[in-house]
């Protein structure tokens, strides 16, 4: 047997090994380097960012949305770019497609909180007037303390609970389910009512600035991954791509090293796993899985892939738009200007049939029909290109009971932290949750 190669990450300062180069791992690495730690980040993919891709996306535009309530995401974005080089953002309204094919905007008023929430709800024509008034009255009673949320929301589905407060099947289908799918990737019929309320509250029941929806014209790679990677390189962090971790070694309930596929052992003072739960559990010692409920409950977490179809059409885009959909496999469509004479459409789905990256003329036809029905694709325009990007494990199932199984960042192992959008952050599993979890891991290390 070949001798075991031991790689020690630092001898002059406390060191941290981070497994996973997705948003959570990158956020933790960036924060830790600013706190003076020596960081080694390991990822099994050729590119950081967490996508299942082989091409280099650094020069590819992939617009994405950021909500005003995503404070950690906004703070990281501003930290990575000087004031003059901040990525271009444009505020956009939220649109819904009704059963008759018409589109309605969710209104935004300039009233202070919480009056703006109540006024916006009453003005929203996507919900029948009687249901609007009933819901607005109920929300007002919550504010005044005359009504309380039920204690069993985590044990009930969102669909059942919304029906119990007077929201009709049609309203749930055209308004609440599209919102739930856009914010969490989950359907009302499968997610818990608590997860639904948690995802809605920051955007609709907070300040007016928190309800702002902005589209960033660039890509996540350009806005986050590239500048973080450049910063890590400049401060001397060690970056290992295309590298598999196979086991976490331990001594006396502390991590003693990470065994890599090539047989070498990576050692540090601290360890942060920023991996999906299904990739984390195979690395753990068997005795931990049976001894600690913290690790045992990871098996209860179920996740699925998310696929984004990037479609370019030969027509200009006057203004960006975001439309939430129903009665289709696609959750939403975001329209932005790819170039002055080209429009880019980003369609999100969790349907696995769209994850296969192969030519499909039927798909192009279906996409053209969908975009034309929304008034986004002109009759004389055609689709010039279609590209897919699949993010594995991006959607965590928020079925009833899941909240109890999402772990906090501090594990029962003294020098092991756990990061990821799927951990317990108070957010649904999204970019904000990933960044918050990475920040918390870094802060937990700094405070010990």
Where are these regions (language model features)?
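Mid-domain catalytic core of redox enzymes
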Residues: 2, 35, 92, 243-360, ...
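N-terminal Rossmann-like FAD-binding beta1-loop-alpha1 element of flavoenzymes
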Residues: 14-40
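Glycine-rich FAD pyrophosphate-binding loop
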Residues: 34-55
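Conserved Rossmann-like nucleotide-cofactor binding loop
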Residues: 24, 47, 278
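Helical element adjacent to the flavin cofactor pocket in flavoenzyme catalytic cores
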Residues: 199-255, 259
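Glycine-rich active-site loop/strand segments that organize a redox cofactor
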Residues: 48-68, 145
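Mobile amphipathic helical/loop "lid" adjacent to a hydrophobic cofactor/ligand pocket
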Residues: 73-74, 78, 84-193
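Conserved flavin/dinucleotide-binding core of flavoenzymes
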Residues: 3-9, 333-448
